[in-house]
């Protein structure tokens, strides 16, 4: 699971970036299942229809990031389980890392870039 920013022109839609777009990595997570569950819920709210939320870029807005920040600070990420996730509940260190990601992503957006979440397994 990872996030990256692309130039505004390369963010084609909520779920698509231009092929070959230059991606600037923001954050990489390994087995942060509750965060992925939150992102999958957001994907569905934005109209995502694929049964499996995997290898699908998800555009994140300032509002999305503010809502995620609130969920992290109130320990309100959805409990998410599954074969690929294992059992690694969020802790103080992962919370710090998540909040740093949000600040960086907000900065990227403020600089005119688009930020996407993606996963692959």
Predicted regions mapped to residue ranges:
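Acidic (Asp/Glu-rich) sequence patches and key acidic residues
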Residues: 1-121
């Amino acid at each position: 699971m990872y996030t990256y920013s692309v130039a505004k022109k390369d963010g084609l839609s909520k779920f698509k970036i231009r092929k070959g777009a230059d991606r600037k990595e923001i954050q990489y997570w390994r087995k942060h299942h509750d965060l992925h569950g939150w992102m999958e819920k957001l994907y569905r709210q934005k109209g995502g229809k694929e049964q499996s939320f995997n290898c699908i870029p998800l555009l994140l807005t300032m509002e999305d990031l503010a809502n995620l920040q609130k969920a992290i600070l109130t320990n309100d990420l959805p409990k998410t389980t599954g074969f690929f996730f294992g059992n690694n509940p969020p802790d103080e260190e992962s919370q710090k890392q998540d909040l740093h990601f949000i600040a960086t992503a907000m900065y990227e957006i403020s600089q005119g870039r688009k930020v996407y979440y993606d996963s692959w397994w």
